[in-house]
């Protein structure tokens, strides 16, 4: 049987493909969202370092953050962003495929209670 990684390699699955699939899916559900660009151009940083690739609002007002990955792992700043979202009742989904987003949305809506940072 072929693995997910082997299938992605065969069809040339990239992180941009995942972002496009996820955004199309969120559109189909009527979820307000946008692509969140971050980076550096010359000497100027833009965006919030570590923030998710796609940010949105679910119908109940819950903040949605989707980090898309293909071959790489989350950076330290991305893990910190995830913790901040989850600690404040947001829904964070780490997505290697569209199925990860579908599963996250189905299981989501049950974010953790906020933790006090002392």
Which stretches of residues belong to each language-model region?
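Catalytic phosphate/metal-binding cores of nucleic-acid and nucleotide-processing enzymes, i.e., regions
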Residues: 1-118
């Amino acid at each position: 049987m072929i693995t997910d990684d082997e299938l992605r390699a065969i069809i040339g699955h990239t992180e941009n493909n995942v972002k496009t699939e996820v955004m199309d899916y969120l559109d189909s559900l009527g979820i307000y969202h946008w692509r969140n660009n971050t980076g550096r151009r010359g000497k100027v940083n833009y965006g919030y370092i570590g923030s998710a690739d796609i940010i949105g609002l679910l119908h109940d007002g819950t903040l949605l953050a989707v980090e898309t990955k293909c071959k790489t792992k989350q950076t330290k700043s991305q893990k910190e962003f995830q913790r901040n979202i989850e600690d404040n009742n947001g829904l964070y989904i780490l997505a290697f495929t569209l199925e990860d987003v579908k599963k996250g949305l189905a299981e989501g809506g049950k974010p953790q209670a906020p933790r006090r940072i002392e």
